[in-house]
Amino acid sequence: MRRALFALALLPMLIASLAFAGDAEIKAAQTVIDSQLKAFIANDGAAAYSFAAPNVKQIFPTVDTFMNMVTNGYAPVRKPQSYSFGKVEQTGPGSIVQQVLIVGPDGKDYEAVYTLQQQSDGSFKITGCSLRASTSVST
């Protein structure tokens, strides 16, 4: 009986610690996205490329091929006027899906959805990004 009460008393602390771990992972993932976007804005291709996961680097094996892909296919991500974080979902241990609301270089609104995966060293890397025009109104 005492064990059951002890376990019951620990349950709220365990749940709270899991929530904080999720918050820490989300913050780490957002920091990666923010850092990559800042690198794009600063024209620092090597820094931007460093946030790409191995699966992305396998497809785009050099900084130049990666930057060409981003420049030609993701102009709002490459040169945003502004951006802010939207909805986020932790889809599994070490897996994050993060919405980023972007005002592109053309002044139009876009939604980028990033996927990130925690690596064996504990860091988060960007495994993918989908981009679409948004129907929201920027402020």
Regions found by a protein language model. Give the residues of each.
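Bacterial Sec-dependent signal peptides at the C-terminal "C-region" and cleavage site
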Residues: A16-A24
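Short solvent-exposed beta->alpha transition segments
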Residues: D23-T31, S35, G45-G94
